[in-house]
Amino acid sequence: MPGNSFGHVFRLTTWGESHGPAVGCTVDGCPAGLPLDVADIQRELDRRRVGQSRVSSQRREADEVQILSGVFEGRTTGTPITMVVYNTDAKSHHYDTIKDAYRPGHADYTWDVKYGFRDWRGGGRSSARETIGRVAGGAIARKLLATVGVTIVGYTLQLADLRAEVFDEAEIERNIMRCPDARVAALMVERVDQARRELDSLGGIVEVRARGVPPGLGEPVFDKLQADIGKAMFSIPAIKGVEIGEGFGVAMLRGSQNNDPFIRREDGSIGTTSNHHGGILGGISTGEEIVVRLAAKPPASIARPQQTVDRDGNPVTIEVHGRHDPTVLPRLVPVAEAMLALVLADHLLRQRLARVSWSERDDG
């Protein structure tokens, strides 16, 4: 099965299934000498981990990462970095009664029709547990980006019809919804609790911002920065829409409103007075903040009775029991951050190959 790797120079390959022995990843192309230890990876995995609050799946996994290769004496060696997380709390018997049924909203049917065989335990490879490898690889990408001053922050912008009205970055990790608006976060928790009681689930929007991105990243024509960001985000389970900058809002603007005037800043750098473009023009970063929004569907695993068919086309009624997220949003945040970091790290290294010498501005 192809399609398990992402990136050109900084390349991530993930492996493993939800109820298999382990999940993990291999990162290839990371330069030698980057300071890195297990704590750097574990910090991000803990933010993605199941069972961390009442608004996430109650599956109990420590998600403790082991680095198997590519790091020596606290620094990367330049060789492939392989990391593993062992699954310790898979309960496959929860799926015994529905293993031959096609769960609505899941990949059961499409995997069956493509491969003729599938791992029915917790979704197998199509499970969101696969994203552990993305977050682990993204943690390394973030360390690399930090060497040039790039920082990334993500948060829950909207749950159903509840949207953050205040942006307080310090508030994001203070509440279990990872929402920058404390008042709206409390309402979101109440709404999730209600959905869980009603055996239902909720979707919403996560926003991710990258700051300090140097201008010049991106590879026209088919590897435009926004194209790779779109591919990265759409590859995340449950994502049904992606916007960059003003996104679909540009359809309501005139050119005179949407254009961002260029200016020369006091430090001599070139910038814009507004950021409708979301930090990317012509597929190349401008140096402004990169702003990405992801629309996530409500989790498909709900305990309500649902009509479907089995592998033979016979009508059946199923109830998906077990331990599932009533909303993916809080745990989606670190995954989305990781994918943006992977794209930017890859393009940072690609840019260093693009010219004999490179700086943010070259007048020579």
UniProtKB/Swiss-Prot annotation:
The entry's FMN-binding residues are: 125-127, 282, 297-301, 323
Reactions that this protein is recorded to catalyse: 5-O-(1-carboxyvinyl)-3-phosphoshikimate = chorismate + phosphate
Provide the cofactor note recorded for this chain's UniProt entry.
Reduced FMN (FMNH(2)).
Q: Name one Pfam family in it.
A: Chorismate_synt
Q: Which InterPro entries match?
A: Chorismate_synth, Chorismate_synth_AroC_sf, Chorismate_synthase_CS
Please tell me which top-level EC class this enzyme sits in.
lyase
Q: Which SUPFAM superfamilies match?
A: Chorismate synthase, AroC (SSF103263)
Q: Which GO terms describe its molecular function?
A: chorismate synthase activity; FMN binding
Keywords, ordered alphabetically: Amino-acid biosynthesis, Aromatic amino acid biosynthesis, FAD, Flavoprotein, FMN, Lyase, NADP
Briefly, what is this protein's role? This reaction introduces a second double bond into the aromatic ring system.
- Subunit details for this protein? Homotetramer.
Q: Which family does it belong to?
A: Belongs to the chorismate synthase family.
Name the record gives this protein: Chorismate synthase
Source species taxonomy: Bacteria, Bacillati, Chloroflexota, Chloroflexia, Chloroflexales
